[in-house]
Amino acid sequence: MEHIRTTKVEQVKLLDRFSTSNKSLTGTLYLTATHLLFIDSHQKETWILHHHIASVEKLALTTSGCPLVIQCKNFRTVHFIVPRERDCHDIYNSLLQLSKQAKYEDLYAFSYNPKQNDSERLQGWQLIDLAEEYKRMGVPNSHWQLSDANRDYKICETYPRELYVPRIASKPIIVGSSKFRSKGRFPVLSYYHQDKEAAICRCSQPLSGFSARCLEDEHLLQAISKANPVNRYMYVMDTRPKLNAMANRAAGKGYENEDNYSNIRFQFVGIENIHVMRSSLQKLLEVNGTKGLSVNDFYSGLESSGWLRHIKAVMDAAIFLAKAITVENASVLVHCSDGWDRTSQVCSLGSLLLDSYYRTIKGFMVLIEKDWISFGHKFSERCGQLDGDPKEVSPVFTQFLECVWHLTEQFPQAFEFSEAFLLQIHEHIHSCQFGNFLGNCQKEREELKLKEKTYSLWPFLLEDQKKYLNPLYSSESHRFTVLEPNTVSFNFKFWRNMYHQFDRTLHPRQSVFNIIMNMNEQNKQLEKDIKDLESKIKQRKNKQTDGILTKELLHSVHPESPNLKTSLCFKEQTLLPVNDALRTIEGSSPADNRYSEYAEEFSKSEPAVVSLEYGVARMTC
């Protein structure tokens, strides 16, 4: 609380950034240790978690007061007008301090207390067991074994303790290969396809320069190739543009020389680096925040940002990986520069295409734990959790979630979860409310003792999983064993519910998704009514001589049925049930639930030119 000088300011205006008439709400602004809270004159609450704040800007004083603009990592933008400049200055300075902490222990997760005892906390962390996940895949087996070479993090600090490697790969080969790979990230197993006996492996770029080679690294790749009894050649996927990889050779890094590695086929897939992605997102947000933009100008700005082209590049890479396994029975080794950004994107998306388990709520959690958290995606740096280098911030994980959303749009019956689940996860990679995404690797998390001092997100999501269920999900999802998405440009849409989730006055529309949810609820209520009626009929059958159920009897069964009275077309829709539990998890009030009104349709085909009123923008190339 030492950073808070002013805790309450009255007569503050909250502007609607898309209103052409500068509409505003007047209320009171509160500053707490964890949140910024605005309560308007109608008692509607707007909660902003300090860790969600990406930037704070105090504009020049105007006749109506001092403007304060807050940009958030979850794409909320708020524009306050504070009556007194001194109060605005105090709030501004406080938010600068509270939104950028210097050490992990000051983050929200270390003070958040959901009133669970130590046993319940531990059970929450034990919910995801990666050893069980590898057993589900079918490893260890005659070709792959669990290695203890990195048990003490001596070979690679950013890898997990337990790693799966080819059975014929000895420890000297592993150690030698690690010395030839950037950050010591040598090739290890990420996913094993039992039916094809093929593997997805991951690593970082080799330190090959223009001519260097390493026999141990060559032997390890050969061991991966031999671990596939069906196909002896393997693909090496470099996820970078070829020019970038060639430029790294000048720095003593680069990519594998095919002359030195037997039975490999090399493939560049051209996903840009974190700096290009950060710039692209910034351009997208600038377009989104422009008031009074025409449809043509919005489309032009969206295309100029390049954002959807980058999403397509990630998706195409995952499709190539999946086809290499399913069509050619080939194992694939994936790497980028350091093996924790683009590599995580491609390995996780490829696994999602191949394995329907990862398309369930629990399976998706396992996938994130496996390919992102355990293998050292730098969540702390990429999400700007601490006051560090802004050039290390990049929306790598956001792109992954967006790719998954596009898959749910193309295959609405194949996923157990709805987009609300993806949005909730995105909320918490930035909230710092739970320990899962804190830190940059497992070793760092163990040193922070996160399992003893913080709580896991996953049990909270599972407890409320009914909120995230996809009503279109087919229990016979085995029909979608392998997903084969179509990546023609016009299949990529602007994800309105991600980037405009808080802009409630921007082209409101009724959600087909919400209609389906309410239809399900109505069907359940009708089924209950039928059972009640049958029970009443059975009880009164001796009294009913003509076999006709009277109006009085119907009324006695269900006298007040709002579901039967309310027309579906005019009923207010809500993507997620609004309750206090949701507020606890999100750090936002029920009345400000941004998921309402904006869900996209799952399977409706749309014309090539679509009004922004429908929340869809197509990419054109």
Curated annotation (Swiss-Prot):
Optimum pH is 7. Keywords: Cell membrane, Cell projection, Cytoplasm, Endocytosis, Endoplasmic reticulum, Hydrolase, Lipid metabolism, Membrane, Phosphoprotein. GO terms for biological process: endocytosis; phosphatidylinositol biosynthetic process; phosphatidylinositol dephosphorylation; protein dephosphorylation. Expressed in CD4+ T-cells. A 1,2-diacyl-sn-glycero-3-phospho-(1D-myo-inositol-3-phosphate) binds at N248, N273, I274, S337, D338, G339, W340, D341, R342, R382. A 1,2-diacyl-sn-glycero-3-phospho-(1D-myo-inositol-3,5-bisphosphate) binds at N248, N273, I274, S337, D338, G339, W340, D341, R342, K378, R382. It is a peripheral membrane protein. The keyword Lipid metabolism applies. It catalyses: a 1,2-diacyl-sn-glycero-3-phospho-(1D-myo-inositol-3,5-bisphosphate) + H2O = a 1,2-diacyl-sn-glycero-3-phospho-(1D-myo-inositol-5-phosphate) + phosphate; a 1,2-diacyl-sn-glycero-3-phospho-(1D-myo-inositol-3-phosphate) + H2O = a 1,2-diacyl-sn-glycero-3-phospho-(1D-myo-inositol) + phosphate; 1,2-dioctanoyl-sn-glycero-3-phospho-(1D-myo-inositol-3,5-bisphosphate) + H2O = 1,2-dioctanoyl-sn-glycero-3-phospho-(1D-myo-inositol-5-phosphate) + phosphate; 1,2-dioctanoyl-sn-glycero-3-phospho-(1-D-myo-inositol-3-phosphate) + H2O = 1,2-dioctanoyl-sn-glycero-3-phospho-(1D-myo-inositol) + phosphate. Its EC number is 3.1.3.95. One of its GO terms (molecular function) is protein serine/threonine phosphatase activity. The modification Phosphoserine is found at S556, S561, S589, S611. It holds the Pfam family PH-GRAM_MTMR6-like. PROSITE patterns: PPASE_MYOTUBULARIN, TYR_PHOSPHATASE_1. Residues 124-499 form the Myotubularin phosphatase domain. CDD domains: PH-GRAM_MTMR6, PTP-MTMR6. It is found in: Cytoplasm; Endoplasmic reticulum-Golgi intermediate compartment; Endoplasmic reticulum; Cell projection, Ruffle membrane. Allosterically activated by phosphatidylserine and/or phosphatidylinositol 4-phosphate (PtdIns(4)P), and phosphatidylinositol 5-phosphate (PtdIns(5)P). Interaction with MTMR9 increases catalytic activity towards phosphatidylinositol 3,5-bisphosphate. The active site is at C336. The modification Phosphotyrosine is found at Y108. Belongs to the protein-tyrosine phosphatase family. Non-receptor class myotubularin subfamily. The GRAM domain is required for cell membrane localization. The C-terminus domain (aa 502-621) mediates interaction with MTMR9. PANTHER family: MYOTUBULARIN-RELATED, MYOTUBULARIN-RELATED PROTEIN 6. Homodimer. Heterodimer (via C-terminus) with MTMR9 (via C-terminus). Interacts with ALKBH4. Interacts with KCNN4. Interacts (via GRAM domain) with RAB1B (in GDP-bound form); the interaction regulates MTMR6 recruitment to the endoplasmic reticulum-Golgi intermediate compartment. This is Phosphatidylinositol-3,5-bisphosphate 3-phosphatase MTMR6. The gene is MTMR6.
